[in-house]
Amino acid sequence: MTFPASRLAAGLVLAVSIPVAIAPAQESKPNIILFLVDDMGWQDTSVPFADQPTSWNKLYRTPHMRDLARTGAKFTQAYAAHPVCSPTRSSMMTGKNPARTHIDDWVGHGDSKNRYLRSPKWAATGLQPDGPHAMLPTVLAKNGYRTIHIGKAHFGGEGTPGANPITLGFDINIGGSHTGGPWGGWISPWLGKYKDVYPNLGDRPKGEYLTRAITVKAVEAIDHAIRDQTPFFMNMAQFAVHTGLAPAPAYIDGYQDGRPKVEADYASMLEAMDASLGSILEKLRDPNGDGNRADSVANNTLIVFTSDNGGLSNHTRAKIGEVRVRPTSGETIEANFERDWHNRPLRSGKGSAYEGGIRVPMLVAWAGQQPDAVPVRASLPIVPGSTITEPVHMDDFFATALDVAGVENPVPQKQRDGQTLVPLLSGRSFERRAPLFWHYPHQWYKDVGTGLGIEPFSAMRKGRYKVIYFYGDGVADGKGYDPRVELYDLSLDLSEARNLAASQPKRCIELRDELVAWLALVAAGIPIVTVTDEPAALPAPGSAIRVE
């Protein structure tokens, strides 16, 4: 499938070919950048999201993330909408939970199953332009925004209209298609046999790293919008740090410090991603690059930084135990690269019901630090260096972006799963309308059954408590389909090491019943029991729980 560059191609050529003075974008409408990293874990940064810095924070260099944390708000309890990519991405574009849209697995995945369960019917083609959902880029475009997609899309399936972000409301698409990872590798894959899945990157040179290429294109797109004095929404969707892991040439030498090769590669990819963030910040702060920031649009640009799901843990990461790492700082770090350890203190990682699979880094900041420079800042006065501990969910991004843009939410109230975070960011009263929910009725990869939580599940967080309903993996008694429930107090047990289901059965049953009622409300797809070819029977209200 060949993708056009944009609906604005002629205008962009004009902007390049005729020298004009760069002027700030319309101050009445703030620019919004969603900087979305792929598979980045809560600990994969030098910014500490735990109560205290950990050894993981010392293993990575992300200075531009630290810049955002210093100038904006850090969310320590931010959650992806799902433990794998496409569902979270669709949630952020629609404001609806993946259970409601039925985009509840990664687009392109076949029928996933473990020994006793298989996938229910789901929206396997992903987001489509003729679907029932209002799309964020479409809504913003109708209200005067230029909408720009850069990098990984993975919204719609191969060969479908939704594979092209332009059909979903983006004016410009650079690099986005049906692919869920860096097909063809990280070094100029747009010049090889996969060139068609990297639309409009063909003018980038041979040998260029993919992260760098999409960054250059993002900076160009920002430049065009500034020249045209047009407010913009940019979905800056990194391919990093998705597998296959490969070193970023500009940064790998800085990680030859005793860590395993795959971990050195991973760290270099993170630093390259952070450098991408830095390039975008610099473009906003000094658009024409002359050192004079009088033309800055940073004060009128909001950046939301986050990840689409929890970090890789067992999948492709090193599993060799403790290693002494001596980074350039000179400090010796005892790093533990054991199985299921890479997101600690969070349990497990991508694909899992546990915190390591869904808790993600999140920063929100104005790119510039002159709060009185533009009127819109008065309605969203983010306190520099603030920490927000309220649990938030990526279902919230849609409503938040519209609120920041001053655009009415077109989704009927009963169909909204997220809510605006503007009051929370502004230090005003914020009350969560409903618990946070996750639903994954599929098997991410292979028949695991080893306590990683990588199996079909539904989960809910309400206040400090999190309940998980596992549909069954047959491990407990070897006789087949065998559902179970787990309960955790995250305020006391962030690592989810102490299942409270047996000691607090009343609370567990109440929360489980609320979760099951919500599944019915949104008509969530339920895993199919292989031997009966029927959906798994959900527990009746008040029924007893099985505890391991």
Task: Locate predicted features.
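Short, structured active-site-proximal loop/turn typified by the sulfatase FGly-forming signature C/S-X-P-X-R
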Residues: 52-89, 95-100, 146-147, 168-177, ...
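C-terminal cap/loop subdomain of S1 sulfatases and analogous C-terminal strand-loop tails that border
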Residues: 172, 324-355, 365, 369-375, ...
